[in-house]
Swiss-Prot record:
Keywords in alphabetical order: Cytoplasm, DNA damage, DNA repair, Hydrolase
Name of the protein in question: Uracil-DNA glycosylase
Active site (UniProt): D65
Family the UniProt entry places it in: Belongs to the uracil-DNA glycosylase (UDG) superfamily. UNG family.
Organism lineage string: Bacteria, Bacillati, Bacillota, Clostridia, Eubacteriales
GO cellular component terms given for this protein: cytoplasm
Organism: Clostridium perfringens (strain 13 / Type A)
Encoding gene, per UniProt annotation: ung
Subcellular location(s) per record: Cytoplasm
EC number: 3.2.2.27
Biological function: Excises uracil residues from the DNA which can arise as a result of misincorporation of dUMP residues by DNA polymerase or due to deamination of cytosine.
Keyword Hydrolase: yes
GO molecular function: uracil DNA N-glycosylase activity
Main location per the UniProt record: cytoplasm
Disulfide pairings: none
Length: 225
């Protein structure tokens, strides 16, 4: 659980793994994985950072904690493994994508192709007990992921930060560098999507910003499997 990302995150985060909070978190997780059903698999915990190197990050989509149902979470915010039913919040994201950019609604919720294009799909807490939302809250992950956000904030190339819902918007305080673009609204969850997520056009706004800084826009279309 001291990760190797095999990219530039290794050097940027190596000191975090030596800190007391992380050593305590590691101890906690070793016991949790031994005694409880934990998601995602320990081999998938850091997928967001493994798939999207620091230098390649164009967009950050912040989530809260991983899906806590069987076979859903695989280390990316909002994404589920192939063959798993698309969860309600992601269904609403696809609906907004359809009305915003005309993307067809895919038959899966596997977002790996976004990660490969420079979208860091980062949850603020990276593990969870099965069936128990927020069960690993306050164990140290927030310190680690705040550090990731702080490092991204320091970057000299602009990044789009997409913050949906109160938990994600609370991280806006860490994004102090004026070169970055912040796009925020209520969460795409069915509980709040009709109060300002639908019609907010976050996907086209992201691409408009990327084009304005001479970056390749994101191909948001998730293909059918």
């Amino acid at each position: 659980m001291a990760a190797e990302f095999n990219n530039d995150w290794d050097d940027l985060l190596k000191d975090e793994f030596k800190k007391e909070y992380y050593l305590n978190l590691r101890k906690f997780l070793i016991n949790e994985y031994k005694t409880q059903k934990i998601h995602p698999s320990m081999y998938d915990i850091f997928n967001a950072l493994k798939f999207t190197p620091y230098k390649d990050v164009k967009v950050v989509i912040l989530g809260q904690d991983p899906y806590h149902g069987p076979n859903q979470a695989h280390g990316f915010s909002f994404s589920v493994k192939p063959g798993v039913q698309t969860p309600p919040s992601l269904r609403n994201m696809f609906k907004e994508l359809n009305s915003d950019l005309g993307c067809y609604i895919p038959n899966n919720g596997f977002l790996e192709s976004w990660a490969k294009q420079g979208i860091l799909l980062l949850n603020t807490v990276l593990t969870v007990r099965e069936g128990q939302a927020n069960s690993h809250k306050g164990k140290g992950w927030e310190i680690f992921t705040d550090r990731v956000i702080e490092l991204l904030n320091k970057r000299e190339e602009p990044i789009v930060f997409i913050l949906w819902g109160r938990n994600a918007i609370s991280k806006e305080a860490l994004i102090t560098n004026p070169i970055h673009k912040i796009i925020k609204s209520v969460h795409p969850s069915p509980l709040s999507a009709t109060r300002g997520f639908f019609g907010s056009k976050p996907f086209s706004k992201t691409n408009d910003f990327l084009v304005s800084i001479n970056k390749e826009p994101i191909d948001w279309q998730i293909p059918n499997i």
